Amino acid sequence: MIETLDKAPFAFTPERLARAQEIITHYPEGRQKSALLPLLHLAQEQAGWMPTEAMDYVAGLLNIQPIEVYEVATFYTMFHVEPVGRHVIEICRTGPCCLLGYEGIRDHLCQRLGVDVGGTSADGMFTVKEVECLAACGMGPVMQIREKYHMHLT
């Protein structure tokens, strides 16, 4: 476990803990690690992002090493390992969206919100992130806000 100073320990609310325990039961004995992604989603729903304390907590629930959780949480762009705004705007930056002009959309959003890519607006409402493929290549440029796709952006 990574020790941090002045940070409150993370624990699921009773409702989320019950949900986590129910999710874990879907996997056979010895294969509970397979519940990692859904538990990370639960943790991020509760915290608003993925603090180290939440990753350590999930590792404890699954009886796995914290590094195993860190590897997964840092691999997927859907998990925010730094604090983010209330609304995260994720803009696809891969080939098809790039060819269709995502840069102009990204630059316009950043200018309007007064942030750089990866930054959060002064009021804490918006974070703009570039992400890898959102799997909507035929509808680019694409961005996602709160798990809702916005396609054919101009």
Please place each PLM-identified region on the residue numbering.
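Signature of N-terminal electron-transfer/Fe-S-associated modules in redox systems
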Residues: 1-154
